[in-house]
Amino acid sequence: MPTDLDGHPLVDGDLTLLPWRDVTSIPGVRDDLVAASNDPEMVRWTTVPHPYTEAHADEFLDVPAPGVARWAYVVDGRYTGNIELRPGGVLGYNTAPWARGRGLTLRAVRLVTQRAIADGVRRLEIHVAEGNVASRSVAHKAGYTYDGFLPEPARQRGYVDELVRYVLLVEEAPKRTDIAP
């Protein structure tokens, strides 16, 4: 996977995906990250620590691990979520509660998908808890195809969630009208 995917902002109308190295330039990002990460839906469907503290935010605001390309969603100058492309071409994303229901995550997935394909990534995946209807809907609407269950469920905070995989193969992408910007 190319290592400089997140070198430049990606823009779609009012949505900017800001490279993570620039995330601290967003006013109030630390407080917004703490608030978003303590949201019940975020706690339920992600592996963020709970309760999520300023110390957790400071650690997360550092540069991502090697091989991970990460962007912050920014709308009207405010942090509204983040998306990352992990090794193996796996996308992960979340949206702050104040920004949900506006199609931002779908647009972010489309932008990162297009960028990854342009940079030579041949296969992309999204792994989602089976019960996370909102994230599954994003994967489907972004043109990813349901590909079954992952071998191991996710275990966190007393929940055991089966994980489903959505896949986009580059050879499919040009034929799919539902992944166009």
Please place each PLM-identified region on the residue numbering.
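An amphipathic alpha-helix signature
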Residues: P27-V34, E54, D58, D62
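Acyl-donor (CoA/ACP) binding surface of acyl/acetyltransferases
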Residues: M1-P40, G67-P181
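Conserved GNAT-fold acetyl-CoA-binding loop/helix
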Residues: E41-L61
